[in-house]
Amino acid sequence: MSNCLCGTGKNLGQPGCTGKIGRPQKGLLTRRLGNDGVENNLKLTDVLGSSFFTGLINQSDISKRLYPTGTIVNVVDERGDPVTYNADNIEYFSSQGNRTFTFEIIDGASPQLEKAYNNFRCQDMCMYLVSVDSQIVGNERNAGILRPFRIEKNTLYAKYIPATATTPERLMVTLTFSVLEKDGDISYFNYTEGGTGAGVLAVNPLDFQGLVDVTMGTATGISVTAFTIPMTYIYG
């Protein structure tokens, strides 16, 4: 059984001060693996400053790119009840329940954004969470490496909800994290304003903004040295 240590155990004492993880305020989506087969993650040996994350967000290789979400609200992050087996009215643990994650986006919600989110559904995607306390939250199953939470393929679904007389236009996104994600492996990087050095999160991840898709028109005024081409946002 997962996390069951036969013949030994874990001490239950705690230090006088323990870190707390704030509620999610943003997500950072990325593919699990790059096209070169290398896992996308953050390491304690990385210098986690502005240039590092700007490079990931603007990465020309989309398999290694980081996709920040907008501000997320009405977050529901719950793990379901465990799967058990009943024998003689005794419930035996079989496996942990699924961890589902639901959120809404109000600022910037549009049908075009719904389409952008749903394009990720069939891909092997992962997501870091960014807390209101500017922490990047992920999985530290292996010491020194913070991995994004793996998303079960084909569970990510975005639904556009039009505005009404009493409610704003918004986007609702739901997903299920992989059964391989264990809550006991959750860890995070704390933001340290003015910090320097390897493994120090020296830039506020709440400030991250994703790239914006554009539609390119027909080139005109073409010469040896220049041309003009109109570009418009897909959002109008």
Residue ranges of model-derived segments:
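Solvent-exposed edge beta-strands and adjacent loop segments
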Residues: M1-T102, P148-P168
